[in-house]
Amino acid sequence: MSTISFFATSKRTSCDRCRKQKLRCPPDKDDMGTCGRCLRAGVACATSYTKPRGRSQKHGISTDGTSHVSGLDMQEPALPTPESVLSAGLTSSVQVAEDGSQLWSPLEEYNHLPSLSNFESGALSQSQDEDFAGLWWSPLHEDLDLDVHMDPSGACQNGYSAEISSFSRTDCSRQSNDCSPETLQHVECDMRLSQLNLELCRQSKAYHHWPNTTSDGSVRRPHFAIASALRDLLQNTEAFIHILHCLRNGTELNLDGRYQEPISTHDTGVSPPSLAFPSILNLTSCFFRIVDLFNVLLSSLALELATHSPLQRRSSSSSVTSALQILPDLKLAGLAVQEVSLQTKILVLTITHHFETMERLLGLPADLRVSECKDDNGYGLLGASWTSVLSSGRREKFELGWRRTGNWVTSIESLKANMGTLTKGSC
């Protein structure tokens, strides 16, 4: 059995190589002071001062800039405080305790970040620009291959470019070139589209909660309420068409968001820009809400006209005709249109024209169209992949929308039937 030899060796006298391996130097050393382990390895044996481990004492940090070591005549600089490291040229208020010593708190780190006004006034230096631009950059941008479908603003496509990293006012023109007018226009259209979708939802909810029923239990709305709802819905439909034109042709969106005739309605034959998936959902939701609203309103209008038709045949006076006005403000060649059948025919033609425009700009297939237009140019905003999903949903009769709107496939077929009924009744 071999004997174990013990020898007294101070840990602080171990060389750097032995200390790194968590060993102690063997007692045999040559004339140069090289330990046996380093001598056998053929490497230089060096002994440095061991660094203290653990967190330094807070009260051991001197705040006057110098600290005197007892027993020595030299002065060494004090260790830097966290505030001096974090400041990096930025000025911040220094908290002073009652005894006059400087205290540091983690909350002071927020004071080192510049305010939002500094970004606008261009108060940041070039080095600070690069540091803060690094906060917005991530290597995941290249790994995930993010595109406009995940980031509508396009800010993630250039992970760390010099244009995005600059926050000074002198580079605003360069930033505006990166954020193209088309991108800003898409953001503006998305915001207006969300507002329009919310307005259509409110209109649907308000109309479905009108508690007007007849003695037999059928739903009846007064004709003046139907006329007001039709006017609001036509205005929202025109606003939706205007947004579609802006997204399709890249034109500017008016402040009121209303549709104007000078905008070109002809296709350029060029594929429209790819939209973000939330924008596609907003477009789809707005279209089918418009379909459902027109379906309910025209169904109520057909019921109202069927109720007033026997009264008109029995009465030769114009009191009944004047009482029932679908479009009371409608004028033709400067003259007010009083005939109900003519108002109905003009209303159906207007709705048909609006649906033809919406379906052409969206690129809907024939089985999802309300109008009889067969123009399938394949350059719609929704894209072929999404329209194929909608077509498969039509075949499987999936339901979209909120609780009382019903099946959107049924709404399309019912709207076609109601428009046909009103067209025959107005002849």
UniProtKB/Swiss-Prot annotation:
Main location: nucleus
Composition skew (Polar residues), residue ranges: 59-69
Region (Disordered): 51-70
UniProt entry tagged with the keyword DNA repair: no
GO MF annotation, one: DNA-binding transcription factor activity, RNA polymerase II-specific
DNA-binding region(s), chain positions: 15-45
GO cellular component: nucleus
Pfam families to which the protein is assigned, alphabetical: Zn_clus
UniProt feature coiled coil, ranges: none
Localization, UniProt: Nucleus
PROSITE patterns found in the cross-reference section: ZN2_CY6_FUNGAL_1, ZN2_CY6_FUNGAL_2
CDD domains per record: GAL4
Protein name as it appears in the record: Stemphyloxin II biosynthesis cluster transcription factor sthR
Organism: Phaeosphaeria nodorum (strain SN15 / ATCC MYA-4574 / FGSC 10173) (Glume blotch fungus)
Highest classification ranks of the organism: Eukaryota, Fungi, Dikarya, Ascomycota, Pezizomycotina
